[in-house]
Amino acid sequence: MNSRALLIISTALVLAGCTVGPDFHAPAPPESATYTREGTPAATAAAQGAGGGAQIFVAAPNVPNAWWTQFGSAALDELVDAALTASPTLDSARAKLIEARENYNAQAGAALFPSVDAKLSATREKIDLASFGITAVPNPPPFTLYNASISVSYVFDLFGANRRALEATLAQVDYEAYELAAARLTVAGNVVSAAVRRASLREQITITQQLVDAQSRQLVIMEARLAAGGVADIDVRSQRTLLAQTRATLPPLATQLAQTDHQLAVLLGVPPSSAQFQPQLDGLTLDTLHLPGAVALTLPSSLARERPDIRAAEALLHQASANVGVATANLYPQITLSGSIGTERTHIEDVVDGLNIWNLGFGLTQPIFHGGELHAKKRAAEAAWDAAFADYRQTVLQALQQVADALRALESDAQALQSRDEAAREAQASATVALARYGVGGVSEFSLIDTQRQALQTALDRTRAQADRLADTAALYQALGGATLPAETAR
């Protein structure tokens, strides 16, 4: 009997190295060499003035981790660092990662090691000897049975059900780690985008107010001319309409600025009413945000290893693969070994006198008929893997699209800024000439103000175009996955 038990146990130990189900392999990266059909331009168009330099795209193995420092603004760096430290979104992601790690630690201990428990109990019993056919001996009085023992049990993972389940839990740890990296990337990107938008809105409000002032002066002149019979009433009404329309653009701009401040406050982990970061916000202008001249650009084949959201989707695919292994292993036998040793006495003071009971048990369970449950669960796990793979492919395709969109946007933004800058310079030159001619009586005050109004309008358009280049550069960095990725959990 002992030799048979040893044979069974030895066989179980040998089989414990067998793991059924698919072994996970990361999907192949995208095969395309470029992000768009037209390819990446050698350089974008250039314009004179702030933010007008040409951008070149430099092939690189990865994107700088702290990519926001490429904008050369100490105030922006402080805001991003503060958000990465205090954002509630990141606090939640960190807590979820800790939760996943502790769940893995708990499952690993239960799956890899025997469970050992100590037991101490007292049971009040009474024996009826007559029920055993013993009638000549009187029944003993009731007594208390004291038990102190240690029990050990272990499930031999013959076909890898526990190992696959542990693999799935470890993949969940990877998922939460990449989700944290993705959240960091999103928070940093949102701070940069909001900072650019805030700087642009402040500049737009300033220029628009100057436009209102210029149009108001024009209206005063036209009303004086109307009184003198120099212009028609319809011309004055047209000027009043233009002034009202320009004034009407100020409240929405002020609302957008306030909402941007509120968004930044939440990203920084403070209430919208807080003025904690006002010095940094006041230091942000479009001219202090420098456009990166050289932008690191990774290959599409590297994108799948650089983007945290793609790595998170890969971790979920890994988890689905491991769950197929769990469902497959559940179709096979399971062996359990258990034993205990201890003492059982009728007087509690005798419990320490020595060991007098032990047991050793062996169990084998082979599923035979479960109404199709186990096979259905295996098919369900395989379908879940198919869904996870489709989600992974969709994530990769969306990432490629985001990079392609950002590249095309930057190319168009540069061309737009070039045109807007040329228009602004020409309008400013006209205003300068008009001012000189006005000084010698060559043009009227109305004409001078009109050329100044045109210069302000073109400056407003240039401001928007300059902000678009900064915002889309940040979008490209974010699309390329500029974030510190965690090392894959060792297996």
Task: Show which residues each predicted segment covers.
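Terminal intrinsically disordered/low-complexity segments used for targeting and assembly
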Residues: 2-85, 131-135, 146, 170, ...
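Short flexible linkers and secondary-structure junctions
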Residues: 19-190, 334-339, 355-359, 368-378
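Membrane-embedded beta-strand positions in outer-membrane beta-barrel channels/transporters
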Residues: 80, 147-151, 195, 300, ...
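Sec/SRP-type N-terminal targeting helices
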Residues: 91-92, 156-184, 234, 238, ...
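Heptad-repeat amphipathic alpha-helical coiled-coil interaction surface used
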Residues: 97-99, 104, 122, 166, ...
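Hydrophobic stripe of amphipathic alpha-helices that form coiled-coil interfaces
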Residues: 100, 107, 114, 176, ...
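Outer-membrane beta-barrel proteins
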Residues: 127-131, 233, 346-350
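Periplasmic alpha-helical coiled-coil/stalk elements that build and connect Gram-negative outer-membrane
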Residues: 162, 178-299, 409, 413, ...
